[in-house]
A protein has these predicted regions:
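Sparse, context-dependent recognition of short Cys/His-centered cofactor- or disulfide-binding micro-motifs
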Residues: 6, 52, 122
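Short, solvent-exposed beta-strand/turn patches at coil↔beta or beta↔helix junctions
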Residues: 7-45, 71-77
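Long, contiguous juxta-domain segments that are non-catalytic but functionally important
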Residues: 1-5
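Periplasmic OmpA-like peptidoglycan-binding domain that tethers envelope proteins to the cell wall
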Residues: 29, 61-144
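Periplasmic peptidoglycan-binding/anchoring modules of Gram-negative envelope and division proteins
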Residues: 27-66, 95, 137, 144-147
Length: 147
């Protein structure tokens, strides 16, 4: 896919667009317009994927769409809140600015912030690496009944 790649280690599709926020910022307007347009295109790709899956499989296949904000490992005590605000900013951008609602019968949307935690961190994971001032989009199939 142009916008997503499958991460074999973590078993999930992950956004490929390189987006990062300035230090301490969470508003989508702090991301360059060109990157916001790419994010919108990725959102449209998600929407098309979900529509196709719904038409093809009906209720038998469900997905979990996670918009995860992250923060750099700089010791700031508000990193969890900041990372959540980054994810929420993208979700609102899709819904309000672009009228793109990714909630469907076959998809649950979660908006979360992992602060300085999470499995897919940019390395080295230190205070000077601002690449973790970003968000990730994960698309996961939901399993059936677990016995």
């Amino acid at each position: 896919s142009k916008w997503f790649e499958y991460n074999e280690l973590h078993k999930k599709h992950v956004l490929k667009i390189d987006v990062s926020f300035p230090i301490g910022q969470s508003e989508i307007t702090h991301i360059p317009l060109e990157k916001r347009e790419e994010l919108y295109s990725a959102g449209l790709a998600i929407d098309q994927f979900l529509k196709h899956a719904e038409e093809e499989y009906g209720e038998s296949v469900k997905y979990l769409l996670i918009i995860e904000g992250q923060a750099s490992n700089d010791g700031y005590t508000g990193n969890f809140d900041l990372s959540y605000q980054r994810a929420l900013s993208l979700y609102r951008y899709f819904q309000i600015n672009r009228h793109l609602d990714l909630k469907r019968q076959n998809c649950e949307v979660l908006v979360c912030g992992s602060g300085t935690e999470g499995a897919l961190r940019a390395y080295p994971d230190n205070a000077s690496n601002t690449k973790n001032q970003r968000f990730l989009i994960h698309i996961l199939p939901k399993p059936g009944i677990i016995n």
